[in-house]
Amino acid sequence: MSVINLLDLDLSSKRVLIRQDLNVSISNWIVTSDKRIKASLPTIKIALKQGAKVMLMSHRGRPIEGEPSDEFSLQPVADRLSELLNTTVRLEKDWLNGVQMNNGEVVLCENVRFNAGEMANDDNLSKRMALMCDIFVMDAFGTAHRAQASTHGVAKYAPIACSGPLLSGELDALGKVLDNPKRPMVAIVGGSKVSTKLTVLESLSKIVDQLVVGGGIANTFIAAQGFNVGKSLCEHDLIPMAKKLMEDCEIPVPTDVVCGKEFSETAEAQTKASTEVSDDDMIFDIGPESIKQLAKIMENAGTIVWNGPVGVFEFEQFASGTKTLGKAIAESDAFSIAGGGDTLAAVDKYGIEDKINYISTGGGAFLEFLEGKILPAVEILEQRASGVDFA
């Protein structure tokens, strides 16, 4: 990746506009999870230390575009930033005409999606954002797969467009995994449907040594082996695709599973061989023998990419597979990277964050990178670094 890096620039007295991912959960006007906010702090501190005028922008939630509302306001984020930075971070509601501020100050611009044209990457809106700054910093990997005004358009027209430390670190870690992985390379792809992860499965099958499937996805592969999956979530129309993937790549399909009769927290768990699932069963986790097999694979791996749980880990009786898998990844000597919302929830739940080498902040962006797709927000930074002029 050849882009301009924030760390290489003189920020003194400059107007620095930083696009961050501050899309956090909020309840009763209080931030309930501040991980993304804390992840943004080093970049902010770098700019403040150099005496820049620091403007932050982010989206939050899915408001009706162009219609400001308290429900999706970033005010609670500004409050939490003020606490973490030990300085006042004011929320700027009317910011498109420029922000009056002093060197060494930081303001948070209200939700970018309150501006009509944000999602459509409107050129006029992008130019107005660009006029606000001397330097635009893209530091939100989680939105890098979206070509929107605050992630892409502004980078076309800002005097300087660069990558922040968070984005650079993310791309470096993912590049390490995909470009020159230590072998054997193992990928775990979980989730409910093959159809939503089909491109990822196809892309990874070409580069990994073993492809582990979990969750509802695994049911389609079990069915592809000719076994009954009962009432389990299964995409029978994709069985031919599952068979092809198994021909192209080593895919250890579960040999035993944990079933229930209904999807509920109180459902009774029954462990069965994959060959013995009855018509009224629903598969919710992998069984103990399959867990042992996966733990051994993790132990011997050189590189691990983890995207998605292997069972319904929200219900304790169906959580053993994901719990044991997570701990096996944590204990492995392999270089490990985890990404995706459900995956990160599992990492949190089992307290293994410090033992995963890299935790990706992106959901959709993480998947699209694994698919080999070009991320628009990164591509525009590369174009600007190479001298392409959009003015």
Curated annotation (Swiss-Prot):
GO MF term set: ADP binding; ATP binding; phosphoglycerate kinase activity
Segments passing through the bilayer: none
Gene3D superfamilies registered for this protein in UniProt: Phosphoglycerate kinase, N-terminal domain
Keywords: ATP-binding, Cytoplasm, Glycolysis, Kinase, Nucleotide-binding, Transferase
Coiled coil residues, start to end: none
GO-annotated biological processes: gluconeogenesis; glycolytic process
Localization, UniProt: Cytoplasm
Residues noted as binding ATP in the record, renumbered to the chain: 197, 314, 340-343
Organism domain of life: Bacteria
EC number, UniProt record: 2.7.2.3
InterPro entries, per the entry: Phosphoglycerate_kinase, Phosphoglycerate_kinase_N, Phosphoglycerate_kinase_sf
Reactions listed under catalytic activity: (2R)-3-phosphoglycerate + ATP = (2R)-3-phospho-glyceroyl phosphate + ADP
Recorded metabolic or biological pathway in which this protein acts: Carbohydrate degradation; glycolysis; pyruvate from D-glyceraldehyde 3-phosphate: step 2/5
SUPFAM superfamilies for this protein: Phosphoglycerate kinase
Record-stated family: Belongs to the phosphoglycerate kinase family.
Assembly and interaction partners: Monomer.
Protein name according to UniProt: Phosphoglycerate kinase
Organism classification: Bacteria, Pseudomonadati, Pseudomonadota, Gammaproteobacteria, Candidatus Pseudothioglobaceae
